[in-house]
């Protein structure tokens, strides 16, 4: 029997879900988020370090919130959450969990609206999304990647418990060029959770941080 919200691979539709933390709600994006998403993505930092289009138009925001994000849930490949404040509903940012080629491996990505940075919101959201990935998606490995030099993203990943694993050359294609990336990963044991398959660390490699 599947845990509540876990994907049924005989029926690949993943029912959208809302996650909650002490200060935040992580809920699926919808058309109502287009205006705030468009405003947030005018920030040069988001356009520089993420793969969002630049310039970022209202049509881009409508496509992301109204079509691409819902479709990701429907085809069980991409789970984008709007991160909002519990008290006011204000959009703090986005956290997305995407499936990778290797079974049980997913990748997390995120951005934070400029006015909400420096308060720990994104770290809080990433931790919750990671826990959900392990318990509901049956993930055995959650990867984080960012272009080399994206220090704020790296700081969030480290605070969320990711272990840095090194650099990858030419591993990101962004705005017409290939870029080098930093890579880190989180596994269920890092959060005190059991994985879906046994994990045998290599000699000299600790299973947990």
Label the model's feature ranges.
Residues 41, 50, 72-73:
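Hydrophobic residues in alpha-helical segments
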Residues 30, 39, 54-58, 76:
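Generic structural signal for well-ordered secondary structure
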Residues 47-67:
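Conserved GNAT-fold acetyl-CoA-binding loop/helix
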Residues 67-68, 176:
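Generic detector of ordered secondary-structure context
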Residues 1-47, 80-209:
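Acyl-donor (CoA/ACP) binding surface of acyl/acetyltransferases
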Residues 68-82:
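A short helix-loop-beta-strand connector motif used in the catalytic cores of GNAT acetyltransferases and
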């Amino acid at each position: 029997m599947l845990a509540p919200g876990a994907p049924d691979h005989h029926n690949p539709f993943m029912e959208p879900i809302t996650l909650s933390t002490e200060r935040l709600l992580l809920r699926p994006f919808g058309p109502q988020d287009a205006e705030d998403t468009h405003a947030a993505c005018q920030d040069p930092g988001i356009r520089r370090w993420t793969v969002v289009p630049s310039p970022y138009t209202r049509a881009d925001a409508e496509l992301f919130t109204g079509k691409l994000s819902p479709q990701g849930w429907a085809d069980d490949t991409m789970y984008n959450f709007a991160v909002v404040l519990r008290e006011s509903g204000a959009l703090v940012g986005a956290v997305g969990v995407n499936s990778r080629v290797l079974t049980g491996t997913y990748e997390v990505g995120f951005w934070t609206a400029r006015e909400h940075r420096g308060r720990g919101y994104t770290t809080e959201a990433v931790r919750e999304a990671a826990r959900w990935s392990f318990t509901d998606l049956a993930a055995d490995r959650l990867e984080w990647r960012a272009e080399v030099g994206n220090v704020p993203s790296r700081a969030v990943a480290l605070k969320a418990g990711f272990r840095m694993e090194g650099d990858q050359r030419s591993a990101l294609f962004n705005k017409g060029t290939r870029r080098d990336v930093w890579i880190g990963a989180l596994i269920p044991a890092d959060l005190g959770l059991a994985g879906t398959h046994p994990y045998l660390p290599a000699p000299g490699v600790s299973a947990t941080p």
